[in-house]
């Protein structure tokens, strides 16, 4: 089991097209603390499901006014369309400054892609999420002790060409990296890698952004990293961190991601990633967020909805995913996406008795990485069972049966990687997210404008970096722009970048 992380908290008038503001995904609703009462995490309800059925929600309390009722006219200082992490972050900062806010969400739950569902007592995140203690906005925006972050092991387990080895630090954040039992180069190569990561951890952002910008793959090839070190550790680690199997991501983004890895610890909340949006929502006044409200069009002075009338405002923020934002704000930059497919299996006992990220460095394998979530925190699985999450990256032709068709191959590969008989494991479900991560090829604009025009704003990870840090930072930037234009605060310096 992973121990809690002892962390400190840092200081810290145009109409658009007639589309829905946020994609209502066919997934179970989560309790909505911003609308009446605190949410409770999913509770175990039964033994393992015998088949790969769709996850069912635990029975949440029904908050007061959980779903908006039809009405004709509403008004607040700011209307935010989308109750994902970016939108909730913007709402939190605006309300803290004394501005009245209404958040409209088309779905029946908050959180967007950062969702956790109960499946017969197993906590399944909506996709493979990893947080990092080095994310600056994580500590600036959230109450970290209440988030109950659980750290992954400081080292990673790598499989390549039939061999297994560990690479990592023995404890704590990485002032330097030590490597044991790892056939990734000579002792000199391993020392160079540890020194390089230590230097990277101390490198200022401005210096990283001054480097020539290439694709990650090309930059790695040109930096003189020994092939065994590159293929045996750096490449598979970056693939897992970026969700990009071809490493076409900007080399500057890759440098920031590696720096974050060297500085901090990969981690997850004890109650699943939905704990992040739930905590954000809990900080908002009751009634701030209205679920089940589909938006037809937006302008700087209001939002027109399908069934709930018009919401007037002095400023309007679109905080949906990039596709929906582009429908509401024609002409907005539209990124490509990296798909992420996550398979969930249950086992009677853990195949790895520690919360260690497993990297599959075999180019012929369908897998990128895997993690025993029940070792991160036992509450991820009921009754002492083990929960294993494994990730397949990239676009694939799964055939007429979809991602389930790949499950037998994934399970066999997991057995090989963990050195166990996985034939008796239960397949719980698979989550396929074709638009999981906005792509960040070079040249990548780290801070796309959040101000469309005075009174009209946009935020989301597609305006920053494709991570929880990007969503949090983008929401903060949008709120700052609104407050500046409303005359509440003066312009301030931009915070430090992180991937």
Where are these regions (language model features)?
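Mid-domain catalytic core of redox enzymes
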Residues: 2-6, 37, 296-404, 417, ...
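Extreme N-terminal leader/targeting segments of oxidoreductases
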Residues: 1-78, 96-97, 489
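Mobile amphipathic helical/loop "lid" adjacent to a hydrophobic cofactor/ligand pocket
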Residues: 138-140, 147-247, 262
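Glycine-rich FAD pyrophosphate-binding loop
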Residues: 95-119
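N-terminal Rossmann-like FAD-binding beta1-loop-alpha1 element of flavoenzymes
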Residues: 73-103
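Helical element adjacent to the flavin cofactor pocket in flavoenzyme catalytic cores
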Residues: 253-307, 311-315
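Short beta-strand to alpha-helix junction loop
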Residues: 130-136, 208-214, 218, 223, ...
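Conserved flavin/dinucleotide-binding core of flavoenzymes
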Residues: 3-8, 12, 63-71, 379-499
């Amino acid at each position: 089991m992973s121990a809690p992380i002892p962390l400190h908290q840092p200081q810290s008038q145009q109409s658009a097209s007639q589309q829905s503001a946020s994609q209502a995904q066919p997934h179970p609703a989560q309790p909505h603390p911003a609308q009446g009462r605190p949410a409770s995490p999913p509770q175990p309800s039964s033994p393992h499901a015998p088949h790969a059925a769709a996850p069912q929600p635990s029975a949440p309390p029904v908050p007061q006014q959980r779903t908006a009722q039809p009405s004709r006219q509403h008004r607040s200082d700011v209307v935010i369309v989308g109750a994902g992490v970016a939108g909730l972050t913007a709402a939190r900062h605006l309300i803290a400054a004394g501005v009245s806010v209404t958040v409209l969400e088309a779905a029946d739950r908050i959180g967007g892609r950062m969702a956790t569902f109960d499946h017969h007592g197993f906590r399944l995140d909506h996709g493979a999420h990893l947080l990092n203690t080095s994310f600056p906005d994580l500590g600036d925006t959230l109450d970290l002790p209440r988030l109950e972050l659980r750290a992954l092991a400081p080292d990673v387990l790598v499989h390549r060409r039939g061999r297994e080895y560990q690479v990592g630090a023995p404890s704590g954040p990485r002032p330097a990296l030590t490597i044991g039992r790892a056939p990734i180069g000579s002792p000199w190569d391993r020392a160079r890698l540890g020194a390089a990561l230590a230097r990277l951890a101390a490198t200022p952002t401005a210096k990283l952004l001054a480097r020539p910008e290439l694709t990650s793959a090309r930059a790695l090839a040109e930096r003189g990293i020994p092939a065994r070190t590159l293929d045996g550790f750096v490449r598979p680690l970056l693939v897992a961190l970026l969700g990009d199997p071809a490493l076409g991501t900007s080399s500057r983004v890759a440098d920031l991601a590696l720096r974050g890895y060297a500085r901090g610890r990969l981690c997850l909340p004890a109650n699943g990633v939905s704990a992040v949006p739930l905590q954000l929502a809990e900080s908002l006044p009751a009634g701030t967020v209205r679920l089940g409200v589909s938006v037809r069009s937006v302008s700087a002075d209001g939002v027109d909805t399908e069934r709930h009338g018009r919401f007037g405002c002095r400023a309007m923020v679109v905080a949906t995913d990039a596709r929906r934002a582009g429908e509401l704000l024609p002409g907005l930059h539209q990124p490509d996406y990296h798909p992420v497919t996550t398979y969930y299996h249950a086992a009677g006992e853990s195949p790895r008795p520690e919360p260690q990220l497993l990297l599959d460095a075999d180019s012929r394998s369908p897998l990128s990485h895997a993690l025993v979530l029940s070792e991160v925190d036992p509450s991820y699985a009921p009754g002492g069972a083990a929960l294993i999450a494994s990730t397949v990256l990239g676009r694939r032709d799964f055939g007429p049966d979809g991602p389930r068709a790949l499950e037998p191959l994934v399970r066999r590969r997991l057995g090989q990687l963990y050195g166990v008989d996985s034939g008796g494991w239960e397949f719980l479900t698979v989550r396929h997210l074709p638009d999981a991560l906005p792509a960040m090829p070079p040249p990548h604009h780290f801070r796309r404008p959040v101000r469309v025009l005075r009174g009209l704003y946009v935020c989301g990870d597609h305006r920053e970096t494709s991570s929880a840090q990007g969503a949090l930072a983008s929401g903060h930037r949008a709120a700052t722009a609104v407050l500046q234009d409303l005359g509440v605060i003066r312009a301030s310096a931009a915070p430090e970048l992180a991937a």
